[in-house]
């Protein structure tokens, strides 16, 4: 098709153009074109100049005059041009298929180098020559950069996207061939060639199978497929029947038959190897079972031997059940039993023997000794079978009686450490025997024991102490001894003391060394009982027991604090209210009652008592005597008499000496006719001044003596001590916000958790912890409890 160029500004042939437009109504209005384009979308057929051939929504064409720059042949020939001719001349023909599109893309003119333009002239001035590359050394591109334009309405893949230059470069690089289309340029991985497995000959297969020999005909078939084999030999009894047919067998048939034989032979070889491996395993397993059978047979024979010894001991056990048998006779009959227990680890010491010899020995002892121990008179024969028990303990605690254990292959013998920990937590067989046989008997006898006669019980327990394990001893103390001693402490009443040996310390002190760590619990009960007795105690009844003996038993001056809090205020009140200093008729009953408590307090505390409450009265009486009608002889005798009344150990007290020195100074001032310094007036409200007067002297005395106490310093409250105790032992001390019904004391709960369902309810009174019994009502009297008992209670729970 030949295209013609039209000049829109030409005015020639206007009449012809108008007639053509009016006749054919070629172009629709702009609005109609836009409307129809929106409706048809991509399905509309429109040429590049906007001409539309569809009859849908056709509108009136423009009537502007059109003139042609170069007239067509029909116009030159003065022919009439119709609308169809104009559309045919200026519209793009419809492409029927993709090949037409490709052919159209090939007809697009190629870009050429313009040799007459301004750019070409500038390049020529800079030394560029056509056909060479750019740059000083002509190393740049030699051709212009080309652009590839896809035709309109043509998708990807319809035409080649590369330019001709890019295709040449790709062919030069080897990416595509000259005749290869671009859509087939995807690289493909080369297929992996399978390596052929080398064929084995019959000899190699027979060698792999070990002692198995291939039949001759199979070996011939296998070797037939090898390269150097050209013939096959048939081993058959009827060779004539084969004839020429067997000789003329083709090579392909031979190879196929050989492959079948080879596959079958390889299957046989694999099965043969499996059978050989199974055979070796069966031999090894048979050897293991045989060895294990022999070991078990030896173990069974030794077990039967051990059982025979046990039955022998059982048959002779009737000798120990005779009640008329004497102690010496029974101990002699125990000698074979001792020999048996000593020889057990010797006869059964093999590492393969997993017998628990200690369990066997303890079972024998429990069976044989149950009746003799049941009939044992503990108090009459306290050392019955003691030597035998000592021998049994040494034997059972030796390593020979422990079960034999194979050496562990674990790192650093971790399992051994675990076993040691378990041994520390559980009872051994010997400990179980002593717990349920010996402890049971001793516990029953201790229930009949009189608490005041501690010597027999202590002799019995101390004699058996080397034999009794520590766990059994602790259980005996907690279950049988401590309850009896605490019961005696709670029932102790100093008013009912009839004999000297009825003192509480005569019953308790002998047990303290044996109790060891449990002694604190007992002393706490004693301290509670002292508090219960001293609180209502009347001073005029005299001193209670010998507190100086008890002071050394308590740690942290617990007894001294109790006496200073309960008894000392009563002594001060008695001295202030009832002690009268009368030189004419002196009554010393109150004075001696106060002196009876001298051993209960420390020397400095008791001296402070006289300095604060006795000497103010005594000095006031001496001052009045010397100032009114002085009689130096009588005053001197009265002074000397009072010094003789004081015991010598108390007279050497620094406070007592200071008081008498002040009286002597007053008499010397009177003899020298000097003005006598009046002592501070004594009154109930003036005791503070008296304390201030002697405060400086007190500090001087404390520097001289090592046995001093800071009595004036405030003590820590008992509640603070209880709270500190609970905090140190991870216990909660929680106030309940209610009080006890009878005493009015605040109630608290001591527990390990915040739950109300756990713990004990207590109240504090007179430095004592009072505990509510489990399940008791609110009006039930509370029981005293010590710190150690609280710990034991929560540890057991």
UniProtKB/Swiss-Prot annotation:
Q: Which SMART domains match?
A: G_patch
Q: Where is the composition biased (Basic residues)?
A: 186-199
Query: What region holds the G-patch domain?
Result: 115-161
The protein's UniProt keywords, in alphabetical order, are: Cytoplasm, Cytoskeleton
Its GO CC terms?
cytoplasm; nucleus; post-mRNA release spliceosomal complex; spindle pole body; spliceosomal complex; U2-type post-mRNA release spliceosomal complex
Which Pfam families does the entry mention?
G-patch (PF01585), GCFC (PF07842)
Q: Give me the stretches of Basic and acidic residues compositional bias.
A: 159-185
Q: Which branch of life, at top level?
A: Eukaryota
What the entry lists under InterPro entries is as follows: G_patch_dom, GCFC_dom, TFP11/STIP/Ntr1
Biological process terms from the Gene Ontology for this record are: mRNA cis splicing, via spliceosome; spliceosomal complex disassembly
One term of GO molecular function: RNA binding
Compartments where located: Cytoplasm, Cytoskeleton, Microtubule organizing center, Spindle pole body
Entry annotated with the keyword Ligase: no
The entry sums up its family as follows: Belongs to the TFP11/STIP family.
Q: What is this protein called?
A: G-patch domain-containing protein C1486.03
